[in-house]
Amino acid sequence: MQNRRDFLKTAGLAALGAGLVGCTGNGGPQKFNIVKGDGKLHMKFFPYELKLAHVFTVASYSRTTTPDVQVEIEWEGVTGYGEASMPPYLGQSVETVTGFLNKVDLGQFTDPFKMEDILSYVDSLSPGDGAAKCAIDIALHDLVGKLLGQPWYKLWGLDPEKAPSTTFTIGIDTPEVVKEKTLEAVGKFNILKVKVGLDTDVEMIETIRTVTDVPLAVDANQGWKDRSKALDEIFWLKEHGIVMVEQPMPKEQLDDIAWLTEHSPLPIFADESIQRMKDIPSIMGAFSGINIKLMKCTGMREGWKMANMARALGMKVMVGCMTETSCAVSAAAQFSPFVDFADLDGNLLIANDRFDGVKVVNGKLTLPDRPGIGVIPL
């Protein structure tokens, strides 16, 4: 008797062969037909610089571009898309990502459905390189989803109608620019995310509050150093409509963060303090929840496991992103119906997106009914 995986594989390939795999979306019906090849997985990749629509400033740096590497995995005529985005604090670059990808031999695999074997092999090649591993993970998930003819949110048993509103990020800037950015976002988003962590925090919030009273999330990016002052600021923030705080203090000050979380009237989420699933036990009790970013945790496979582990431990879950194209953002959005908060606006911050994918409609994430991660190259 076939096991479940073999059944799904056979059913998916049978549907493909019959030309029945089709999901409608912005690109219309899609059909994937198996083209006889050598039976091996093939990967190609190329650098792609993301150009930001505005200068992006957080507590520790500013930038106008983000380095990125686009990845494609092909099997028997069907292609899955992935990407690696490398903001400065990840400590990765186009050179390190392409260097890692050049070491990966996917040609040894002839069955894309053996995802655990493939991704475990990729992960074993180095202790780091999270973004590079993520690019392969996303592309493989996209490929397998296409072969099965289903988006991953359906394969995970999630209801797309439960996808949350996404935050839209307002970076640190002058009051004039902050006001301009906020005016652009009003009416399009139900919650905004504000970068804080400098002496201008109060001015930032007060400027935004002259424009809108929508709920706000704040991200200090480790910018606060004194726990008592941080707590005073959090109480002030709560009075001004803030609903959550992300990474208030440096990750090295875990005891101070735990104290802050214990006394805070708002939930405190870990970002820089966590990368992978193995990190969750070490921050238990210090944070109310975790922010899962695919570029840090090596992709969808581990991100989904982290979300379930955090839930089982009674923690809140947030899914976030880097500055990315709609490829990686749509991948992260596949488990957004499972989370408490979503910060999936990275594709909206760039001027040269390569894909059509997840949309924001009336402030809410809208997942395309297309197989895999749901993206179409532009």
Write out the residue ranges for each language-model feature.
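Metal- or metallocofactor-binding catalytic centers and their adjacent structured scaffolds
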Residues: 32-45, 61, 74, 79-147
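Catalytic alpha/beta core domains of metabolic enzymes, predominantly
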Residues: 255-257, 263, 269, 273-344
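Flexible C-terminal active-site loop/helix
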Residues: 12-14, 35-50, 68, 76, ...
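N-terminal secretory signal peptides
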Residues: 1-3
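Short Pro/Gly-enriched beta-strand edge/turn motifs at strand-loop
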Residues: 49-57
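N-terminal export signals
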Residues: 6-26
